[in-house]
Amino acid sequence: MDRSRIEKISKALADKTRLKIFEAISRSEKMTCGEIVSMRGVTPATVSHHLKILSEAALIECRRQGQFVHSKAVPGTIEAYSRALAKIAGGKKSAHRK
């Protein structure tokens, strides 16, 4: 995973509302915008905005099924992100560390 992808995912998950939305989607098979609105107590426009950012970070994918758009977590993204962070953290140690 390249540095720009790591940064994009980090920024997407840095917002507490987005993190909660991602957590809810990850724990379910799929969710609609309406289900997220009901659960989180935010407006549909706000949910749509957050879903777009999560989707652009490739954390979720959204698919239209009839009149609903279902969102689900992209398998493997968080695992790859965790490995990339571990690789960064396991790099050269700073001269300031003891």
Language model features: what each stretch is:
Residues 38, 49, 55-56:
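Alpha-helical residues within the helix-turn-helix
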Residues 30, 58-59:
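Short hinge/loop at the helix->beta-strand junction immediately C-terminal to the helix-turn-helix recognition helix
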Residues 23, 51-52:
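Core alpha-helical elements of the protein kinase catalytic domain
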Residues 16, 54, 80, 84:
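Solvent-exposed, charged/polar functional surfaces in cytosolic regulatory/catalytic domains
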Residues 1-6, 23-27, 75-98:
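Amphipathic alpha-helical dimerization/coiled-coil segments
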Residues 4-45, 65-77:
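N-terminal helix-turn-helix DNA-binding core of bacterial DNA-binding proteins
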Residues 48-49, 95:
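Intrinsically disordered, low-complexity cationic segments
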